[in-house]
């Protein structure tokens, strides 16, 4: 009954439906033209597609905490809670739909610590790698 008339009682069913729609959109976009897809298990969804570059961008906990406090103007306690909550949710989502951790290097072509070069430097590095790989 809940599957036919979801009224908020079957949250996972709704999340599964959303994932299926996102999957169709991601595959459609990737097959039509060049694009950048952030998250949404795109490494898993596009694993059999040609001309894909799977990049995992991360930063050490301390850098993430400082970013939340300084750039997002969060208290340190709120930042800690938010980081923990977001990490847990991302990991659970990716493990549910892809079957592995989002940080699993076996499913990435490249992993970059963004604290080394900053946001702009990391973007420049990725742009150069894309130019060399696809042009």
Model region roles, listed by residue range:
Residues 29, 42-48:
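RNA pseudouridine synthases
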Residues 23, 119-127:
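Short, amphipathic alpha-helical "lid/cap" segments that border enzyme active or binding sites
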Residues 1, 75-120:
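Small-molecule kinase domains that catalyze NTP-dependent phosphoryl transfer to phosphate-bearing small molecules
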Residues 48-70, 76-86:
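Conserved phosphate-donor/acceptor-positioning beta-strand/loop module used by diverse small-molecule
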Residues 1-34:
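ATP-dependent small-molecule kinase phosphotransfer cores
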Residues 42-43, 59-64, 116-118:
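Conserved nucleotide-binding/hydrolysis micro-motifs of P-loop NTPases
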């Amino acid at each position: 009954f809940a599957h036919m008339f979801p009224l908020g009682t079957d949250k996972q069913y709704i999340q599964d439906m959303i994932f299926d729609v996102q999957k169709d959109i991601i595959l459609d976009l990737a097959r039509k033209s060049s694009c950048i897809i952030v998250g949404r298990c795109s490494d898993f969804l596009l694993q059999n597609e040609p001309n894909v570059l799977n990049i995992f961008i991360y930063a050490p906990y301390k850098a993430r905490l400082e970013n939340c406090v300084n750039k997002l103007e969060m208290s340190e306690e709120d930042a800690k809670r938010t980081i923990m909550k977001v990490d847990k949710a991302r990991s659970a989502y990716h493990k549910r739909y892809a079957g592995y951790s989002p940080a699993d290097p076996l499913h990435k072509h490249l992993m970059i610590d963004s604290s080394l070069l900053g946001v702009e430097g990391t973007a420049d590095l990725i742009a150069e790698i894309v130019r060399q790989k696809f042009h």
